Structures are given as C-alpha cells and as structure tokens.
Amino acid sequence: MADPEVVVSSCSSHEEENRCNFNQQTSPSEELLLEDQMRRKLKFFFMNPCEKFWARGRKPWKLAIQILKIAMVTIQLVLFGLSNQMVVAFKEENTIAFKHLFLKGYMDRMDDTYAVYTQSDVYDQLIFAVNQYLQLYNVSVGNHAYENKGTKQSAMAICQHFYKRGNIYPGNDTFDIDPEIETECFFVEPDEPFHIGTPAENKLNLTLDFHRLLTVELQFKLKAINLQTVRHQELPDCYDFTLTITFDNKAHSGRIKISLDNDISIRECKDWHVSGSIQKNTHYMMIFDAFVILTCLVSLILCIRSVIRGLQLQQEFVNFFLLHYKKEVSVSDQMEFVNGWYIMIIISDILTIIGSILKMEIQAKSLTSYDVCSILLGTSTMLVWLGVIRYLGFFAKYNLLILTLQAALPNVIRFCCCAAMIYLGYCFCGWIVLGPYHDKFRSLNMVSECLFSLINGDDMFATFAKMQQKSYLVWLFSRIYLYSFISLFIYMILSLFIALITDTYETIKQYQQDGFPETELRTFISECKDLPNSGKYRLEDDPPVSLFCCCKK
C-alpha cells in the first residue's frame, strides 16, 4: 500500500481532490490509518532536533548553522565596534579641540554656562575666532586644513540675524518692533590679510545693534584625515567638519550664549597610498564578511523552508480536521504551526546580510555610513543571541523563562497600556506646571526620563531639592505631584506588575509538575505513542504517491 501521508498532502493541495475525497466512502481501517499517519506527521513536526535525528536520522543543520553564525556574527560585530570606536573618538576629540581653538577662554564642561555679558566681549570673541581661523596652520596641532574649492580655499561666513526694525524703551515700557527677520553676511578669505587691533579699532566691518540682534553665526569648513586607523591595519578616512559658532541673543536677557556645533561627514579619500600589509588585511576582512553573508544566506534559506513547511502542514491539518471531524481548527492551534523563532532568525539574517554588505563597502572606502551599519549589525547580533534561546527551551530546566514570557506577554501588554495612560497624564502635568521652575521638567522628553528614573528609585532627593521656591503654590503642588507619583507607581503599579509576572511564573511551575492544559491539537497528537527511535517515522520519508487515484478516473 502506498504511503497514506501523501493522500492528505495531495488532498490539501488540490481543491478538486478534496471534494472528491470528501465524497468518497472510505473504510474505517483506512480512516484510522490516515489519522495515525497525520498524528505521526504532526508529532514529528513538533519534535526537537535531537528527537528528529533519532526518528529519521535528520541532521540538525539549522542548529549547527546557528551555532556557527552566532560565533561569526559576534566576531564581526566586535571587529566593527573597535573600528567604529576609533571613528567616534576622532569625532569627539576634534570637537573638543575646535572649542578650545576657536572659543576664547573655553574650558571643558562649560557648554551650558559659556556666555558673554558685554558688547566688548562679543567683539573680542568674534575677532578671536576669525583670527584663529586665519592662523589655523600656525596654531592647530592637528592635521586640519581649509576646504579647497578649485584653486581657492573656502571662506568663513559671518552672518547676523536681526529684527527688521526695533525701537525699544524699557524705561517707558514702550517698544515699536517689526518681527520680520533680516540677515546680513560677509566672508573672510583665509589668504586675506587681517589686522588685529582693539575692539574699538577693528570690528570686522560689522556693526551690531544689540537691541535688534537675534544671533550671530560664524560658519566655516575644515578637513582632516584620521590616521590612527593605520595602526590598526585599516585604511584612513577623510573627514569634513562644518563648524558653526553661534552667539545666541534671542532672549535679549543680557546674556549671550555661545555654542560651537560640529557637523561631521566622512568621505572616501581621493588619492591615497599606504605601504605595508594593510591592503592584505583589508582583503582578509572582506573575505570573512563574505563568509558571514554566505552563512546567513544558508540559515535564511533553511528557516524560510521550515516556515513554508509549517504553513503547508497547517493547511493540511485544517483540511484533514474539517474532512474527518467536521470541525474547524481554532486560531490558537493554527498559530502553533507558525514558528516565531524562525521568523526572528529570518529577520536577523536579513539584517546581518545587509549590514555585512555595508561593512564591506565601508572597508573598501566606497561608503561611510557607520551609523546605519551599526544599527543593522547590532540589532542582528542581538536577535541571533535571542534565537539561541529557542534551542535551550527544548530542555525542561531551561525553558521556564521562555514559557513565562510567552504566557505573561498578553496580560503585560494590557497592563502596560493602562499604566501608560496614567504615566502620560503625569508627564503632561509635570511639564506644564513644573517646567518653568525645575530643570528636569523643561521638555516632555526630560519629564519622561525623570519620571522613569523615579520609578526605579534613582535621583529622588535631587529631584525634590532642585525645585525652585519662587512660587510657594507651585512648590506645594510639586510636593503633592512627586509624592503621589512615587507612591502610585512604586508601591502600587510596579508591585502589581511584578505580581503579574510572579503569578504567571508560579502557574508555569505548577503546569510543569501537573502537566500543561491540552489544546485540541496537542490532544490529537498525544494519541500517537510511537517513540522517536521506533523506526515508524522513517516510513513517512517515502516519495509521495496518492492513494485516491480513483478520484481522477
């Protein structure tokens, strides 16, 4: 007799044969045989890799690929991280160097307090920054240079933004102002002579009307080459620094804040030559990345094949149940055929392949998108490590975490949705009421971060202590606000959240001792008592031949 497995497969695949099979009268023995075959097929599908090896001698290729992949992807990420670390360090050190170079009297950690308060100090700062720019080659200890535009070097743009008209008389409490903003700019060429005198003698041909002035911006470009990568057997990158020094007088409070912003872009060096073995090492790294791509491609194909087989078996089982039991399979039972771990591995493989391609482009200096590559490789590595948990879950002593998370997730999501409503209410209230009086409540983002820190018990005293006492009513409100938030979230909501997880954990432990509730699918499978090493599962591997040939006759 031919393998009955194919009967079910054939009937589930072709609607015409399904109708034929449904109408055909089969003997009770044949029906029992079909049920037995379906149970055995389902039981084999839900076996772990070791049991499948005992049942049919099938090698656990996906497990071997995942173990190999986790080692290779982790090594790749570490190597890329070390390279990216040099890029980040070079950016940060250059930004600090530029602040010391172009901001007069700048000291570290002065970004929030660096400001001037007199007109002469404003002109001093402007003249100092321009002079440092013109004397760059004489004052800078780095390999910085002006940007070349053809035969000329890029100029520094000095722009002031101010109200079109403004007559302000604070003594009389009167003003006349046109809020339209105008801009005036002029340029300073690096090769032009520049005479430095006193602020009264030389004001850069720039006259500032501080009553109307909003901002003054000095913008210029510099270039540099990151040579430290050579010591790590990597080709250097070329950097473009777009520097903007801003004198902010928008508040007109008598305090002009000064800041330096550094917009950095990495470019491929146009003409380079490095002696030694750097080129060879670069080729080795690209070969390694190519092998990672090949490994992930194999993993991707195997997992996609497994997902497709699961969906095919799902449809086959649904048709079988409808044909023999006149019942529809529940959605929860159907979802058991969709392996979420495989889907996660597929996503990680796709991210790794794309990230590895970008990494190879970066190493070849034809691409400089470090941030995108970091996100792709970092996310993929995280998912690869999480995917290994699936194989640990096949052991009863290791799958408690997985089962608890799966069981608790729906209730946790519902609970978090309710808690989020309360949390957002406190965020909006704290921002609008406490924002003018507390540094940690100046923006919605800062409010959310501050409240989340309070939930974790961090920085509580500082949050209370930094509240200004200029308004007694607001100060009293802040105490009620903070005490109620801490009491509500730490003692009630957080405790209920932990209790929700704990209750699920205890339930899972009890299930492990007394047995899990049987679904309709699991009950159907449990009637198959054949052990993996019984040899009966090997019969399912025969080529497919339909038993119901008479349907087509």
From Swiss-Prot:
Task: Kindly list the residues the record flags as site (Interaction with phosphoinositides).
Answer: 305
Keyword Nucleotide-binding on this protein? no
| Catalytic activity entry | Ca(2+)(in) = Ca(2+)(out); K(+)(in) = K(+)(out); Na(+)(in) = Na(+)(out)
Q: What is the effect of changing residue 423 to A?
A: Nearly abolishes channel activation by a synthetic agonist
Covalent S-S links between cysteines: 159-185, 238-269
List where the protein spans the membrane.
63-83, 284-304, 342-362, 372-392, 415-435, 476-497
Q: Which gene codes for it?
A: MCOLN3
Instruction: Give the activity regulation note.
Output: Channel activity is activated by PtdIns(3,5)P2 (phosphatidylinositol 3,5-bisphosphate). Inhibited by lumenal H(+) and Na(+). The channel pore shows dynamic behavior and undergoes spontaneous, Ca(2+)-dependent modulation when conducting Ca(2+).
Alphabetical GO CC annotations of the entry are: autophagosome membrane; early endosome membrane; late endosome membrane; lysosomal membrane; plasma membrane
| Post-translational modifications reported in the UniProt record | N-glycosylated.
Task: Specify the protein name.
Answer: Mucolipin-3
Q: Which biological process terms from the Gene Ontology are attached to this UniProt entry?
A: calcium ion transmembrane transport; inner ear auditory receptor cell differentiation; locomotory behavior
Q: List the carbohydrate attachment sites.
A: 138, 172, 205
Q: What is known of its domains?
A: The most N-terminal extracellular/lumenal domain (referred to as I-II linker or polycystin-mucolipin domain) contributes to a structure with a four-fold rotational symmetry in a tetrameric assembly; the structure contains a central highly electronegative pore with a 14 A diameter. The pore is critical for Ca(2+) and pH regulation. The protruding structure formed by the I-II linkers may contain all the interaction sites with lipids and proteins in the endolysosomal lumen.
The effect of residue 459 to A is: Decreases in Ca(2+) permeability and selectivity; decreases channel pore dynamic behavior
Provide the effect of residue 252 to A.
Answer: Increases inhibition by lumenal H(+). Decreases inhibition by lumenal H(+)
* Intramembrane annotation, residue ranges: 444-464
Q: Where is this motif: Selectivity filter?
A: 456-459
Listed result of changing residue 419 to P:
Constitutive active channel; abolishes inhibition by lumenal H(+); increases the pore diameter
Q: What is the lineage of its organism?
A: Eukaryota, Metazoa, Chordata, Craniata, Vertebrata
Q: What is known about what this protein does?
A: Nonselective cation channel probably playing a role in the regulation of membrane trafficking events. Acts as a Ca(2+)-permeable cation channel with inwardly rectifying activity. Mediates release of Ca(2+) from endosomes to the cytoplasm, contributes to endosomal acidification and is involved in the regulation of membrane trafficking and fusion in the endosomal pathway. Also permeable to Mg(2+), Na(+) and K(+). Does not seem to act as mechanosensory transduction channel in inner ear sensory hair cells.
Q: How does it sit in the membrane?
A: Multi-pass membrane protein
GO MF annotation: an example: sodium channel activity
Annotated stretches, region: Interaction with phosphoinositides: 52-62
